[in-house]
Regions:
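Enzymes and membrane/adaptor proteins characterized by extended Gly/Ser/Thr/Asp/Glu-rich
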Residues: 35, 68-105, 129
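Acyltransferase
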Residues: 21-25, 54, 245-248, 270-297, ...
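An N-terminal boundary/leader segment
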Residues: 1-51, 287-289, 352, 358, ...
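Short glycine/serine-rich loop segments
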Residues: 101-103, 107-231
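Short, well-ordered beta-strand elements within core beta-sheets of diverse protein domains
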Residues: 10-16, 75, 94-98, 209-216, ...
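A short helix-breaking turn/cap at a secondary-structure junction
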Residues: 190-276, 281, 339-343
Length: 365
């Protein structure tokens, strides 16, 4: 069984009867069991995945209508709600939290007969760029386990890169899909804000974060986007993409397309190897007929400061709900003295989260 096939190849193989979803999912679970002790991509594995794949195979054989995923095994970053499943955000604060509803992206994938293979690791509450800030231990880069996989969607990137699933969903605020995709040699895409519903995503920074796919190929990313994008009455920031087909023009080429090269982003302290790779990419785009023009965005110098100001402030507000009453551990509080209680409640957060909470309290004051 070739676990290295792309999403579109998997769909075609199952549709044609060359492979069964059940066998593929079973082999994927075996793969997880054999490699994930070293990689630690998964926080939980769905033991019912094979049963779900079996149901889909029955629909294929009987000629019933089958969703676009045809039983494809997909991993989900553990900050998205799947009903009746643990959703921990890689935090002790939510270690025992069981989601009471499905995120909209989960509902859409279920409608298209995806199989959720498990929930994957992240930096706690999606705050970090290495997946070292998980309360349940760091994930490892499958190309070299001495290296980090990037973050915060490190578990998503590792699971795709190590053939523990075909595709994954992550979330991206300041690079949390794109960064681990780069580190693990997968495709990571942060869609336009509002293109994908954030309903059921446990919030870090509402103004910036966005759910996005991690896949093996660009076509697979477009395939996933076709499924999970679109208007949602539960998220009033969503856009109506009018059932756009993101695969329709993917082979049409880029001749004549204008691409802006931000000059402030390719100078200064950029690493020489990164600069060289960027210049190679520009040359490749030009060889394919694109028009690459240098543009100036002088405000980009403030982007990191603006990012931390917005995200820390919103994170501080969002994290205020985790008070150990509605979420977190139960513990006796001596005399219910407030400062003692708050101090103990905050021990359920890791150092990176606490740091951002402190900044989030300081900045707006």
């Amino acid at each position: 069984m070739n676990l290295k096939i792309s999403a579109l190849e998997f769909v075609q193989e199952v549709k044609n009867g060359n492979i069964s979803a059940e066998d593929f999912v079973a082999k994927t679970l075996e793969r997880i069991q054999s490699v994930d002790d070293k990689l630690h991509a998964f926080l939980s594995v769905n033991e019912e995945a094979v049963d779900k794949a079996q149901e889909i195979d029955k629909k294929v054989k009987s000629g019933d209508k089958v969703g676009a995923c045809f039983g494809m095994p997909i991993s989900i970053k553990d900050n998205m709600c799947i009903k009746d499943s643990k959703t921990t955000c890689a935090s002790k604060m939510l270690e025992d939290f069981v989601a009471p509803y499905d995120a909209t992206v989960i509902t859409k994938l279920k409608e298209q007969d995806a199989v959720f293979i498990g929930k994957v690791n992240l930096d706690e509450f999606a705050m970090g760029l290495t997946t070292e800030f998980s309360a349940f231990g760091p994930s490892k880069n499958p190309w070299n386990t001495e290296y980090v996989p990037g973050g915060s969607s490190g578990g998503s990137a590792v699971s795709v890169s190590a053939f523990e699933c075909i595709a994954s969903l992550g979330s991206d605020t300041g690079g949390s899909v794109r960064n681990p995709a780069s580190f693990c040699s997968t495709v990571g895409y942060k869609p336009t804000y509002g293109l994908i519903s954030r309903y059921g995503l446990i919030s870090y920074s509402n103004s910036i974060e966005q759910i996005g796919p991690l896949t093996r190929t660009v076509k697979d990313a477009a395939f996933m986007l076709n499924i999970i994008s679109g208007l949602d009455i539960n998220d009033n920031t969503t856009l109506d993409d009018k059932n756009e087909d993101y695969l329709s023009e993917i082979d049409s080429g880029i001749e004549g397309k204008k691409i802006g090269i931000i000059k402030e982003m390719i100078g200064g302290s950029i690493d020489p190897a990164v600069l060289s790779a960027t210049k190679d990419a520009i040359a490749k785009l030009e060889s394919l007929g694109a028009i690459c023009e240098e543009v100036s965005l002088d405000m980009v110098q403030y982007s990191v400061a603006a990012y931390y100001t917005i995200t820390a402030t919103e994170a501080g507000s969002n994290l205020a709900r985790y008070d150990n009453l509605r979420y977190g551990y139960d513990f006796p509080v001596e005399g219910y003295e407030f400062n003692s209680y708050i101090s103990k409640a905050r021990k359920n957060f890791g150092p990176e989260v606490i740091q951002r909470m402190i900044i989030g309290g300081f900045v707006p004051s």
